[in-house]
Amino acid sequence: MSYDLALGYLVSQNKQYGLKAIEILNAWAKELQSADTHQSEDNINFYMPYMNMAYWFVKKVFPSPEYEDFIKRMCQYSQSALNTNHGAWGILFDISSALVLGDHALLHNSANRWQEWIFKAIDENGVIASAITRSDTSDYHGGPTKGIKGIAYTNFALLALTISGELLFENGYDLWGSGAGQRLSIAYDKVATWILNPETFPYFQPNLIGVHNNAYFIILAKHYSSPSADELLKQGDLHEDGFRLKLRSF
């Protein structure tokens, strides 16, 4: 909610939106001192990017030392060192933290880590091996529904990488044309092909989950060419748009 309110403020300059956004962020800063479970650590890793970006939108008019201290406390829970979807979101967590804190060293390190993650997690064919086997059972990478969430988890990781790449691009690190960027473009075309023609997905089965969670294509289409992705964008069936990419461009 803080992200939507802050974005509303950014677009409309209605201070009521900004005040409500900072109220929510400050409440989190006051109440959450540490993470006591693995699930809470995961939640911090996945949701702090939205909160940090919300603060970034309102910081100039509504600065909050309390929220900035909160970020510093929470940074220890970033999972950016992992070569999984958790790691991709951890990189976005780190980048968003670096931007709001003005931490140039963290931003520089995150730019390097973004490239490293891509080379380690995405193969030369554009496949994220740790994602495509995901099932919907407690046997995360096996069982009778092995791969049913494979496209969904691929989308989830690529969403974080895409937002990270664009934030880096707008803040002095143009990596879209780098070797890692080219590897990302292959992954973009690969997942677009799977979404457009699900039967080509290695673990194709009825009722694949999260196939069209690809609103992030809106950004990648600015930098890369993919006929399959272009067709999907034309169709407009784009979901998982938590960053409201349909309403704004970074």
Regions found by a protein language model. Give the residues of each.
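Short, charged, amphipathic alpha-helical segments
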Residues: 22, 178-182
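Short, solvent-exposed helix-helix connector turns and helix-capping sites enriched
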Residues: 103, 181, 225-229
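Short conserved catalytic/interaction loops centered on acidic-Pro-aromatic/His motifs
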Residues: 172-178
